[in-house]
Amino acid sequence: MHNQAPIQRRKSTRIYVGNVPIGDGAPIAVQSMTNTRTTDVEATVNQIKALERVGADIVRVSVPTMDAAEAFKLIKQQVNVPLVADIHFDYRIALKVAEYGVDCLRINPGNIGNEERIRMVVDCARDKNIPIRIGVNAGSLEKDLQEKYGEPTPQALLESAMRHVDHLDRLNFDQFKVSVKASDVFLAVESYRLLAKQIDQPLHLGITEAGGARSGAVKSAIGLGLLLSEGIGDTLRVSLAADPVEEIKVGFDILKSLRIRSRGINFIACPTCSRQEFDVIGTVNALEQRLEDIITPMDVSIIGCVVNGPGEALVSTLGVTGGNKKSGLYEDGVRKDRLDNNDMIDQLEARIRAKASQLDEARRIDVQQVEK
């Protein structure tokens, strides 16, 4: 694998969302948002637990009503992952969920109310040591900024964000992160670039309302990838009109591709052609589903023929190179065995699980030695 220098991240202050550190060099946190009715406690808890299983660091929950706030109390008691309450329009809901142990408040300054209401929310957050996310969105800019700029622009999003950053500064509150989201990739990227030069608080990245599973993943990969490659961003959400679990998977895939943070298996697979000696696509799809529980970072190359297979296998944790009836299995760049093409999936799953256990044990021993 090419020896790329690590991305130099923007310096920022640190806050904590529950027990998850955000900013100041902490691992970039991946989060999602529930799409159940919050008042359906069972469904919401089940979805949050599903997000936890695929690695969500933080989960946001919409709390649109006081009934939802009461449901939030019950939800919080049944999950372990830190929860962010998404609050719009009614500041009193923010005060209520703060009583119930919320880990972070997300407010949209364009619709939460006047300065006095914001002050009440901030005072409550300070008293209970709850961080705030200032969530600026191109679709809900303040009316005066809409009139001033005519349309959402990077300068408009920046002015909205700075207006409320300044407000929190005047209230001597510094436990916050900021987002300036837009559905347009260029608008979002430039807004974040401008904001990154103005403040040193952590930045939450996102391309809002990005689209369905395919188009939304592409937009997010481009927008977030550009910013992350420049060292901008401390936490992220991939917004998809899809199962929230997919948001977490895509988020980790983006970080994995940039070598910022790895979780689970990085599959390297050829797009296939008539040279393939076994069903590459079927093998990859099956293994991705079967091995979702593996969190050990490792590269697995699955190549259908000998044209590129050996080269990819040399730089993979495990690699398969297609051959006639049997395919070569490489481990850490060394050819170890041959696998029957008719039983490829089961054999490879077993080898990957064994390798993951081996790597986990080696890391455990390393940690013990360091602690001594």
Swiss-Prot record:
Effect of residue 322 to D: Loss of activity
InterPro entries: Dihydropteroate_synth-like_sf (IPR011005), IspG_bac (IPR016425), IspG_bac-typ (IPR004588), NO2/SO3_Rdtase_4Fe4S_sf (IPR045854)
Cofactor note as given: Binds 1 [4Fe-4S] cluster.
pH dependence (record): Optimum pH is 9.
Cofactor: [4Fe-4S] cluster
One GO term of the biological process aspect: terpenoid biosynthetic process
Tagged with keyword Iron-sulfur: yes
EC number, as in UniProt: 1.17.7.3
Record keyword Cell inner membrane present: no
Pathway(s) annotated for this protein in UniProt: Isoprenoid biosynthesis; isopentenyl diphosphate biosynthesis via DXP pathway; isopentenyl diphosphate from 1-deoxy-D-xylulose 5-phosphate: step 5/6
Entry's Gene Ontology cellular component terms: cytosol
Transmembrane segments: none
Example GO molecular function: 4-hydroxy-3-methylbut-2-en-1-yl diphosphate synthase activity (ferredoxin)
Keywords: 4Fe-4S, Iron, Iron-sulfur, Isoprene biosynthesis, Metal-binding, Oxidoreductase
Amino acids binding [4Fe-4S] cluster: 270, 273, 305, 312
Role of this protein: Converts 2C-methyl-D-erythritol 2,4-cyclodiphosphate (ME-2,4cPP) into 1-hydroxy-2-methyl-2-(E)-butenyl 4-diphosphate, using flavodoxin as the reducing agent.
PANTHER family per UniProt: 4-HYDROXY-3-METHYLBUT-2-EN-1-YL DIPHOSPHATE SYNTHASE, 4-HYDROXY-3-METHYLBUT-2-EN-1-YL DIPHOSPHATE SYNTHASE (FERREDOXIN), CHLOROPLASTIC
Family: Belongs to the IspG family.
HAMAP family attached to this UniProt entry: IspG (MF_00159)
Name this protein carries in UniProt: 4-hydroxy-3-methylbut-2-en-1-yl diphosphate synthase (flavodoxin)
